[in-house]
């Protein structure tokens, strides 16, 4: 009888990626099939996130519901992974002794063995260590699920922003070897993937070891991924202003596969608050990056992260943030009220901002960004947009759902054989959360690009004179 696996995922795209790898791993090693029904499952896995407030209590509430299932089905295996597991492993073991397996983001590759150990020893197994990049060497070959795919290129963060738990839960920055990243993407491309999103807590800090002992920069990686046959659209998330150098900006000038949309977190427009956050940039330095980007790619649209109500944030600090939002003209944002994370320096900062004031600031910020986003959407009316068809529309199964470069969903009438392909559509209507379009042309009429090899892309990126001095020639 086939064993069933349920994975519940909270948090960022890195967690979504990790959960997909857990499913691949347990499917390949033990023949588990995914289910969405907890009552059918033989293994229940919770992949957790510790970014938001009350993350731990949310975990224990979910585990309490699963405990009822385990009481009725004693052989049921319950596992907790992700950042809360790393941060609160011992506490989980004490408060929820019925949990069989506790693992961190860096040890998910050991999951099959940990499950077997818990079953044979009939006692909980925990491994929340940081074995750096080892997990990627022990995962099965990637399996494509549609025309888009996420690929993790690095783990961890070494910036230690005062509000953030990532360095403590995922470790410091470790880059995957270049060949491993390219091979995974090439495998996905062979399975029909057309768009790749490179993942990491700080992707532009990527420094991937190469087979010749050299180091590949993020800019070089972008060009090489863009050269892989079949990959026609390239995204990345999340990046950091500190390492968003001119070499990365130059990629926007000569690599059309890289989309005209960038998520670049700034968190605040107040230099005083940025200093308290240990963000090593000013608002002006951030705007300087955006100016260079728009010179390289005039139509690029920018999204960002914002924290309001950070301890000590005054009305002026908040207005500085609002000014930055208007000056940069952000298209989208992920914005939150500050939530103290245990173990971070900011958790000890005194805060006397009334809760209602925090909520009012958040509402004002979101209203401003939403109005800017709607204006951008209206500018797309009656224009042609190249979109990647992802599948049936979620609102009308007789229509198709596609995505623009600037991350907007477009619904349009078309046949199912267009799924996984690029098409051009004319935007005919604009809504708050989506667009409507009409099919103009299909992929066979496009002539998307001339294929270049990775070696040709590297030659384009790296040239050295007789003294060994490198120059970039676009």
Curated annotation (Swiss-Prot):
Location in the cell reads: Cytoplasm
What positions does the domain TRAM occupy? 378-441
Which residues of the sequence carry a binding annotation for [4Fe-4S] cluster 1? 12, 49, 83
One Pfam family name is TRAM
Cofactor dependence is on: [4Fe-4S] cluster
Task: Give start-end ranges for the coiled-coil region(s).
Answer: none
SMART domains in alphabetical order: Elp3 (SM00729)
Indicate the segments forming the Radical SAM core domain, all copies: 143-375
- Where in the numbering of this chain does the MTTase N-terminal domain appear? 3-120
At which positions is [4Fe-4S] cluster 2 bound? 157, 161, 164
The EC code for this enzyme is 2.8.4.3
Listed InterPro entries: Elp3/MiaA/NifB-like_rSAM, Methylthiotransferase, Methylthiotransferase_CS, Methylthiotransferase_N, Methylthiotransferase_N_sf, MiaB_methiolase, rSAM, rSAM_horseshoe
Keywords for this entry? 4Fe-4S, Cytoplasm, Iron, Iron-sulfur, Metal-binding, S-adenosyl-L-methionine, Transferase, tRNA processing
**One GO molecular-function annotation for this sequence?**
N6-isopentenyladenosine methylthiotransferase activity
Q: Which domain of life is it from?
A: Bacteria
Q: Which reaction does it catalyse?
A: N(6)-dimethylallyladenosine(37) in tRNA + (sulfur carrier)-SH + AH2 + 2 S-adenosyl-L-methionine = 2-methylsulfanyl-N(6)-dimethylallyladenosine(37) in tRNA + (sulfur carrier)-H + 5'-deoxyadenosine + L-methionine + A + S-adenosyl-L-homocysteine + 2 H(+)
This entry's comment on the bound cofactor is: Binds 2 [4Fe-4S] clusters. One cluster is coordinated with 3 cysteines and an exchangeable S-adenosyl-L-methionine.
Q: In the UniProt record, which is one GO cellular component term? A: cytosol
| Function, as annotated | Catalyzes the methylthiolation of N6-(dimethylallyl)adenosine (i(6)A), leading to the formation of 2-methylthio-N6-(dimethylallyl)adenosine (ms(2)i(6)A) at position 37 in tRNAs that read codons beginning with uridine.
The subunit structure is: Monomer.
Family the UniProt entry places it in:
Belongs to the methylthiotransferase family. MiaB subfamily.
Which protein, by its recorded name, is this? tRNA-2-methylthio-N(6)-dimethylallyladenosine synthase
Q: From which lineage does this chain's organism come?
A: Bacteria, Pseudomonadati, Pseudomonadota, Gammaproteobacteria, Vibrionales
| Gene name tied to this protein | miaB
């Amino acid at each position: 009888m086939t064993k069933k696996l349920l994975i519940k995922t909270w948090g960022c795209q890195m967690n979504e990626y990790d959960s997909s790898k857990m499913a691949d791993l347990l499917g390949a090693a033990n023949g588990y099939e995914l289910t969405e029904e907890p009552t059918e499952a033989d293994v229940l896995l919770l992949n957790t996130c510790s970014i938001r407030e009350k993350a731990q209590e949310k975990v224990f509430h979910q585990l309490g519901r699963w405990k009822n299932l385990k009481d009725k089905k004693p052989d049921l295996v319950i596992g907790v992974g992700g950042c809360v597991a790393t941060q609160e492993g011992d506490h989980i073991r004490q408060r929820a002794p019925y949990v069989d397996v506790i693992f961190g983001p860096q040890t998910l590759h050991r999951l099959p063995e940990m499950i077997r150990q818990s079953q044979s020893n009939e006692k909980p197994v925990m491994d929340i260590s940081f074995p750096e990049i080892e997990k990627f060497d022990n995962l099965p070959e990637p399996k494509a699920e549609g025309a888009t795919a996420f690929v993790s290129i690095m783990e961890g963060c070494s910036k230690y922003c005062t509000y953030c738990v990532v360095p403590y839960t995922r470790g410091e920055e470790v880059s995957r070897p270049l060949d491993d990243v390219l091979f995974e993407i090439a495998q996905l491309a062979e399975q029909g993937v057309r768009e790749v999103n490179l993942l990491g807590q700080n992707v532009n800090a990527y420094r991937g070891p190469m087979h010749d002992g050299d180091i590949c920069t993020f800019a070089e990686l972008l060009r090489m991924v863009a050269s892989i046959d079949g990959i026609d659209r390239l995204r990345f998330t999340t990046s950091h202003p500190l390492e968003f150098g001119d070499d990365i900006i130059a990629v926007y000038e000569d690599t059309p596969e890289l989309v005209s949309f960038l998520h670049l977190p700034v968190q605040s427009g107040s230099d005083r608050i940025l200093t308290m956050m240990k963000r090593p940039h000013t608002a002006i330095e951030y705007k300087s990056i955006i100016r260079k980007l728009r010179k390289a790619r005039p139509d690029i649209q920018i999204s960002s992260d914002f924290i309001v109500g950070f301890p000590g944030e005054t009305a002026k600090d908040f207005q500085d943030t609002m000014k930055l939002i208007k000056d940069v003209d952000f298209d989208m944002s992920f914005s939150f009220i500050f939530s103290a994370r245990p173990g971070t320096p900011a958790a000890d900062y005194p805060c006397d901002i009334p809760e209602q004031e925090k909520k009012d600031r958040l509402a004002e910020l979101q209203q401003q960004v939403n109005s800017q986003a709607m204006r951008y959407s209206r500018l797309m009316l009656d224009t042609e947009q190249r979109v990647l068809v992802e599948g049936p529309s979620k609102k009308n199964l007789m229509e198709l759902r596609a995505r623009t470069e600037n991350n907007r969903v477009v619904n349009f009438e078309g046949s199912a054989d267009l799924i996984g392909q690029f098409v051009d559509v004319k935007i005919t209507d604009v809504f708050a959360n989506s667009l409507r379009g009409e099919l103009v042309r299909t992929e066979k009429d496009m002539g998307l690009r001339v294929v270049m090899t990775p070696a040709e892309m590297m030659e384009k990126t790296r040239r050295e004179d007789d003294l060994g001095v490198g120059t970039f020639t676009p």
